């Protein structure tokens, strides 16, 4: 399976196999960092054949832009008949971007095995949630695309695990 973290999801990258030393070298733009010193952020990934990769895409900064990227990645899983799922993290601000909506719609229509985790930070940069959307909950936006949505308290690790596992299992089933 493949995931695409946000810049705040360093823990997810570590779970997928990135090492603290690797991350520090990346931040310092060292020649032996994952991007060979060409980038001094955590915008690096490791994706390729399922057996040869740690399975995480490098992040890109614009809000919501990884959703259509992951929709395309997961479409390729379907086209090749691979039993793989893609998971993408976005912040609440990303749900107000065109790229987010295009990616969600594309994934839904093509039945891509994609799971989107929306982290509600309460603010997108300096914009409060109340100025972004009139939806009572971000999962309400899923209804418009005909896809299921679940909610969990992000501070409850077990609840997040349970919701994520259900979503991944559902995506894998098609």
Functional labels for PLM-detected ranges:
Residues 111, 116-119:
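Short internal beta-strands
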Residues 118-174:
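Thiamine diphosphate
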